[in-house]
Amino acid sequence: MDTLSHKTLSSNKISADKKWFVVDAEGQNLGRFSSKIAKVLRGKYKTNFTPHADCGDNVVIINASKIVMTGNKLEKREIFSHTGYPGGQKRITPKEMLVKDGTSVVRHAIKGMLPKNKLGAAILKNCYIFSLEDHDKEAQKPTNLNLNDLI
């Protein structure tokens, strides 16, 4: 590469250098954890970050069912959804979500921190969440990621 060139290089889906990371969610605060994962998925910490392209990394999250929420948010917070029919508003607490599916609370938090468009949906597909410690992504050889090293 020409180091004296004054060109701005823009990354795209093909030229993006995607890595695989594994992150342990046990004992982590949900909001701080999710915002750091969203930055890694989006690729915002990379020098060749491009807002309109999927240039982020793939993340494997283990122990998602052991995530922590401060205070009594686990019982008091309500997450709303709507079926699309009149009177079809549904409410569920994070505690009920964890009982139903151990990964849904983390997935919901990360999804809320990504763009609300087709790119956000594509980026979320790079996140693999498992409620326990075992996962099926050993073939990709993911490296451990310490979230405290990220800003």
Task: Identify the residue ranges that each predicted region occupies.
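Ribosome large-subunit tunnel/peptidyl-transferase-proximal elements
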Residues: M1-H108, K118, K141-I151
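Aromatic-residue detector
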Residues: R42, I129-F130, K137
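Hydrophobic, well-ordered secondary-structure segments
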Residues: V106-R107, K111, L124
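Basic, amphipathic alpha-helical segments enriched in Lys/Arg and hydrophobic/aromatic residues
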Residues: L119, H135
